[in-house]
Amino acid sequence: MNTKLNIIKALGILAIVAAAFSSSAQQDPMYTQYMFNTQTINPAYAGTWESLGFMVLGRNQWSGFDGAPNTYTFTMQAPLRNERVALGLNVISDKIGYEKRFYVYGDYSYLVPVGEKTNLRLGLKGGFTNYSHNLEEHNILDPNDPAFIGEITHSFKPNFGVGAFLYSKKAYVGFSIPKVINSNFDITSENFSIEGELRHYFLMAGAVFDLGENLKFKPTAFTKASFTSESGTPVQFDFTGNFLFKEKLWLGAMYRTGDSFGFIAQFLFAEKLRVGYAIDFSTTNLRHYNNGTHEVMISYELKFRKEEVVSPRYF
């Protein structure tokens, strides 16, 4: 019985890793609350808060399944004395099975006013990804399998990205390529190899509509595309609808094509502190083997300007 369970466990982890690195959907960490975490994929988003801001996010994908992806994210953005310039920082730890990726990227964003109430930000992102894989941690049936003989392997890959973000108080459109350079991690053994980073194109849009004195509706759409031969899913779409009650409570739902659906809740404290929770449920065969995906986000803003804030940020 134990041997059978070990085989099932090993096959399960192998299936997760294979799916994660053979399809475009998992080449970079995915987020359900992407509309408040845009900076990780679009450097032009830095500066849109118009204040010093911090965000932390933890995502436990396919909860209850050994070796499933776990992602921890920290971002910050800060305007400079030159009000048109803002800087950002993104630090991400992503683990799938025995494989780990650690991302550190800095952002530069420049503001171009295009109208009385509309702004365009252009951004540049630069940094690196460090990949590591500890072959000795594998619980395998054959300890002499040459594919799993070795110690910790590492690979370091620098990269850069570009982005644009057009926005007003209640609407936005963004486009970005967070990693321009296609690269491989060049970690291979007799029976297994790891793909590196593929170039992805992101297009996003959202708007806020007043439905009443204390009720607003925000639909958003998010598209991720990769046109390389290595990508298993060339195009993926996210659709989200959120309702805002009394400028404090967000409640909504999301759908990701070919992957999952879920629900989102966020609460705003004093317009500076935002706490959000999201849960996803897989629509693939993996739904039978996990308890959903859980995501918690906390963001905080330090506002130094004296003018009164009329309403909170909508994205």
Stretches found by the model and what they are:
Residues 26-315:
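Subset of outer-membrane beta-barrel
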Residues 1-12:
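Bacterial N-terminal signal peptides that target proteins for export
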